[in-house]
């Protein structure tokens, strides 16, 4: 995913630290859900609390966001369009999205894969698996 505010497998705790560091309402980022595989979390800060909105992948690649109860179901063709919608006030979130918190390094998902590969390559074992 090529969005600068997508942080991959960022933990909830690390997410809260990043968003609350500046103490500004409307800071936001996207991360993978820790509890539901394949679901994204749009996290936004407001009054020193981080609010999390789940984003589900629908049929045909569309995205659906969970907002305030009673709000109509909202579906978007892309994540960029979804974010754009919620940058406007009064759209069903606690606060509109103001400032994306961009990742400063490759998303954790890819960094984790690289670390796994380095661990495998750098193992000090004399045993070598040979594939048929």
UniProtKB/Swiss-Prot annotation:
Is Phosphoprotein tagged as a keyword? Answer: yes
Domain SH2, by residue range, is 5-101
Would you name any one GO CC term?
cytosol
What InterPro entries does the record point to?
Answer: EAT2_SH2, SH2, SH2_dom_sf
- Which UniProt keyword terms apply here? Adaptive immunity, Immunity, Innate immunity, Phosphoprotein, SH2 domain
Which spans of this chain does the record mark as coiled coil?
none
> How does this chain assemble?
Binds to the phosphorylated receptors CD84, SLAMF1, LY9 and CD244. Does not bind to non-phosphorylated SLAMF1. Interacts with SLAMF7 (via ITSM phosphorylated on 'Tyr-304'). Interacts with Src kinases HCK, LYN, FYN, FGR and LCK (via kinase domains). Interacts (phosphorylated at Tyr-127) with PLCG1.
Q: What is this protein called?
A: SH2 domain-containing protein 1B
The record lists the organism as Homo sapiens
